[in-house]
């Protein structure tokens, strides 16, 4: 079972919180969860034992390893859009309970490295409800698979994500 929610702004409060689910059938018992300002993660997919970012080129073609139908490797100098969630507050803030549309930059800066090279996203923020987007130019890297590392306020995404690059 899975429940996807938009958590309300807890005004900086972090730590244990009680979650109660209410619907037409009634209400659940309280579940304990941990609130944090950010718990970042990229959306990913697994293929042949490797984890790739759910990323696209500007023409919406999915980025992935070579020789896989329907996907293409990233190229050095190319702008790639990465997607994730949990990267924290934006400015302007998102109104709780309202559907968001538009673009809102993150309040705090994201640190990102691809293949060990620091990159600065041209945009890092919310692009729709619950969806963070990062527009990043791929650095000058050799052909191959390169680690993707990201963090915000010293909280890192899970390790093991690689992006395929081919000149």
Task: Please provide the spans of the model-predicted regions.
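A sequence-level detector for low-complexity, Ser/Thr- and acidic-rich stretches
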Residues: 1-167
């Amino acid at each position: 079972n899975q429940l996807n929610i938009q958590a309300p702004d807890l005004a900086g409060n972090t730590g244990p919180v009680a979650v109660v689910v209410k619907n037409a059938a009634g209400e659940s018992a309280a579940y304990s969860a941990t609130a944090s300002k950010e718990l970042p993660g990229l959306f990913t997919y697994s293929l042949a034992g490797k984890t790739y970012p759910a990323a696209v080129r500007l023409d919406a073609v999915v980025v992935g390893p070579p020789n896989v139908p329907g996907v293409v490797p990233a190229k050095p100098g190319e702008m790639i859009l990465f997607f994730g969630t949990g990267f924290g507050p934006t400015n302007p803030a998102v109104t709780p309970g309202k559907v968001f549309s538009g673009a809102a930059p993150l309040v705090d800066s994201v640190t990102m490295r691809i293949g060990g090279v620091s990159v600065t996203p041209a945009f890092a923020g919310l692009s729709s409800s619950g969806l963070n987007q990062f527009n990043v130019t791929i650095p000058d890297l050799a052909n191959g698979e390169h680690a993707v590392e990201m963090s915000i306020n010293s909280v890192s995404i899970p390790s093991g994500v690689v992006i395929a690059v081919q000149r």
